[in-house]
Amino acid sequence: MKVKICGLNPSRDVQLCIDLGVNFLGFVFYTKSPRNVSLQDIEILKTYNRLKSKFVAVTVNPGNEFIENIVQKHFDYIQLHGAETKKRVEEIKSMGLKIIKAIKIRNENDIDKYKEFESADIILFDTPGMEKSIEFPKNLISKLPKGDRFALAGSISQNNIENMKKLGVTFCDLSSNLETDAKIGYKDHQKIKRSIDKVNELKN
């Protein structure tokens, strides 16, 4: 099972995630989010030996200037979490970037929207609301396409990740459930370790 952890702090969380072998490390560029990182924050990213981990810039309707000056210099992937059209995704793809396109699923009718974004390298099925920890409905998970190109987000943690595997999910995106109880946006390193331990256990 592949894992992406989103909403990381560039100086506090990255080395741990690399050491644990987390596949994708997500950094949020969204000023309304308590997980938002600044341009100054990400300067430290160039100092890490990423090994097999990929760095992801999580964005909402990004402009070309931001993509050219920030994403292309520091990140392996860009995650598009806004209202980007098929044409816009193709434009960004033409800039030489690997793309994760988030699809917000409210009901079964939303699932086929992913077919519009053939240029995306990864499709992330998520619940509505970028900053809301809402569990993905189990009745819809069984209807999602499966495989390494398709990831699932939505209140996933060490407590339900085994159920995700049983439902055929092979790529999970974790975020808010890895945070401390005291501070939103602040990752709990013990929760990260326990979650990755659980993933590794499921591989055996």
Model-derived regions: residue spans:
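Conserved N-terminal beta1-alpha1 strand-loop-helix module at the mouth
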Residues: 1-204
